[in-house]
Swiss-Prot record:
Coiled coil: none
Lineage of origin: Bacteria, Thermotogati, Thermotogota, Thermotogae, Thermotogales
HAMAP family noted in UniProt: DisA
Reactions that this protein is recorded to catalyse: 2 ATP = 3',3'-c-di-AMP + 2 diphosphate
Activity regulation info: Inhibited by 3'-dATP.
Comment on protein domains: Consists of three domains: an N-terminal globular domain with diadenylate-cyclase (DAC) activity, a central helical domain and a C-terminal DNA-binding domain.
Nucleotide-binding listed as a keyword: yes
Protein name: DNA integrity scanning protein DisA
The protein's enzyme class: transferase
The protein's role, per its UniProt record: Participates in a DNA-damage check-point. DisA forms globular foci that rapidly scan along the chromosomes searching for lesions.
Similarity comment: Belongs to the DisA family.
Length: 357
């Protein structure tokens, strides 16, 4: 299913251009190490931007990190192709519209911000004084971090994620027991959802750092995938299970996305979005709710969601599904002998396992 990043995907794609392991990043690091500055403009077609490119000289040569480094010794800006395969111009003067607002102070960075806003293209500024790489794209600005800082930040975040994932799994396991006993409260559901939202929010906050790490972030990407595998799917199914009114998968995904972008949503706000009219958090323990059964059908019995809709439409709740015989289940469209037994046996097996734990 997947969720949107807190950092826009279009910006993440541009951050990838300057991640460690790329030729462009190698050149930028060399420029910083030599205590140079640089202003680099990435374009699709240089002829489109002749009104903002003045002076300098036309090269139209293949890109290499070494060439870019040598050209940065000159005072003017450098114009590259967007795919970083060509160097079009060197030592040019970039002249964006001076009326475009900018929050920057240095000349190089003011030019970069205005040009990115005016053209919607990537402009990279390297500060000679502060040894910082800044990427401007449209109205966005992203300051590139040092690799050591990124590794430290990502390592800490993954350690935190491991704890959150353990807690989330524990809450899910407890919820399963309550579901099978038909004594789930709204508080149980909200607590589980909140922990899942927090987990995915941390993931989206560190994702740009992992992208920025490039080749250095391969291990972190693997750990992140392992820690978050199916979490968003589980949360969507929980929302579908416990919304007061029936909701489609797409609606549940939108609800999930909304909560991930919020800062620490309250139990009350989660309850209300699920459709429950509660005024105080203490009320959540008094509201009994029943799962529809989507999560169990998909994750335990391995029933496709399209067929799961039919099962829920007939039996309404997980409690009723668990009481249905194989023959009853076979009356559902899309459920034959094999799937009926899969549902019945998976519920029985789960009950037995939870009882013996």
């Amino acid at each position: 299913m997947g969720v949107k990043s807190l950092v826009p995907q279009e910006l993440i794609e541009k951050i990838k251009l300057i991640s460690p392991g790329t030729e462009l990043r190698k050149a930028l690091d060399d420029i910083i190490n030599a205590n140079f500055g640089a202003l680099i403009f990435l374009v699709d077609d240089p002829k489109k931007y002749e009104d903002v490119i003045q002076g300098g000289f036309w090269l139209d040569t293949d890109f290499s990190a070494e060439k870019l480094y040598e050209l940065s010794k000159m005072d003017g800006a450098i114009v590259l192709s967007e795919d970083i395969t060509k160097i079009y111009y060197a030592n040019v003067h970039l002249v964006p519209d001076p009326t475009i607002p900018t929050g920057e102070t240095g000349t190089r960075h003011r030019t970069a911000e205005r040009l990115a806003k005016q053209t919607g293209k990537v402009v990279i500024a390297v500060s000679r004084r502060r040894n910082i790489i800044s990427l401007y794209y449209k109205n966005y600005k992203y300051v590139v971090n040092q690799v050591d800082f990124l590794i430290s930040k990502v390592t800490q975040a993954i350690s935190t994620l491991e704890k959150y994932k353990d807690n989330f799994n524990k809450l899910l396991s407890e919820l399963e027991v309550l579901e099978l006993e038909n004594r789930v409260t709204l508080a149980d559901v909200v607590r589980t959802l909140a922990k899942g939202f927090e987990l995915l929010r941390i993931v989206e906050e560190i994702r740009p750092y992992i992208v920025e790490l490039g080749e250095e972030g391969r291990l972190a990407r693997m750990q992140l995938r392992e820690l978050t595998e199916d979490v968003d799917d589980l949360l969507v199914l929980l929302i579908m299970d416990y919304s007061s009114e029936e909701v489609e998968e797409e609606t549940a995904q939108n609800i999930l996305q909304d909560f991930i972008t919020r800062r620490e949503p309250s139990p009350i706000s989660i309850s209300r979005v699920l459709g429950y009219d509660v005024q105080q958090a203490a009320q959540l323990d008094d509201v009994l709710v029943s799962a529809r059964g989507y999560r169990l059908l998909k994750t335990v019995a391995r029933i496709p969601l399209s067929i799961g809709y039919n099962v829920v439409r007939m039996f309404k709740t997980l409690d009723q599904i668990s009481k249905a015989s194989v023959e009853d289940l076979k009356k559902v469209e899309g459920i034959g002998e094999k799937r009926a037994r899969a549902i019945s046996e998976s519920i029985s097996s789960l009950k037995h396992r939870k009882t013996s734990e």
